[in-house]
Amino acid sequence: MPTEPSPAATDARAAVAAALRDVPHVPGAPKPDPVLIADDVRRMFGGVNAVDVDHVEVQRGAITALIGPNGAGKTTFFNLLTGFDKPNSGKWTFDGRSLGGVAAARVARAGMVRTFQLTKALNRMTVMENMRLGATAQPGENLFAALVPAVWRPREKAITEQAEELLARFKLDTKRDDFAGSLSGGQRKLLEMARALMAKPQMIMLDEPMAGVNPALTQSLLGHIQALRDDGMTVLFVEHDMHMVRHISDWVVVMTEGRIVAEGPPDSVMNNPAVIDAYLGAHHDTDLGDDALLDDAVLEQLRTEDEEAR
């Protein structure tokens, strides 16, 4: 990562902060330029409301964290929005287009892609083959077009070039011909994020991108997530590490028992009694993102990250 942010990155962060400055810190707060709007989304399992979201909006171009204790419904909500599960009720739009009830493949083609808490790399395929699978608009998938190389070869070349660029960006280019199953857990997280970008999405949804990743790769992932925002992409991610959430998020949405109970900038949310109660019970004198709770090594990493972002 560079020691100083580029002018474009600084402008992107400032623009997001300015856009969200006057947004009220309440659940379901309206945003000035929402790319995703969801209303009355419900999902029940055996009579239990796993998701019970009245209204939520995600600001275009921002990094929004979706946090909450285990079992809060975060991943289930992701599954509903991206077509991997069906709600009992509800509707949502992405960039003005209704995506309720739309299949996962069509959601991805619409510009909203996701990664998974447990990586979905195809272990017996190479890293490059995994990357190529992430691209859309592949004429070679059509039986008749596949019989005419002149139809699909130009697109295949463009896809390969795009994959090479992304692998270099994520420092996986030396692994291009390795089987995905040979990668470390952190490298598979990087591969999944890079593969998602092959679809050239407007918005990427990351489900616990830091889970099981060693500290060195954690810093790399944080940098990549911030770079997506700086390039104008919208990021919505689930994360349990409150310190990471505080240091990279523009906005935080909090779920518990399927409901959204708080929203706001990281510092505001970390001190919200409703949020602290959801995580820690009655310990309302605790700041969930208090850096004093970190060990010296991790705190130094985060301070370095902040200095580089200024």
Residue map of PLM features:
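Catalytic Walker B motif of ABC-type/P-loop ATPase nucleotide-binding domains
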Residues: 204-208
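A short, surface-exposed alpha-helical micro-motif characterized by mixed small hydrophobic
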Residues: 245-247
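ABC-family P-loop ATPase nucleotide-binding domain
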Residues: 1-42, 284-310
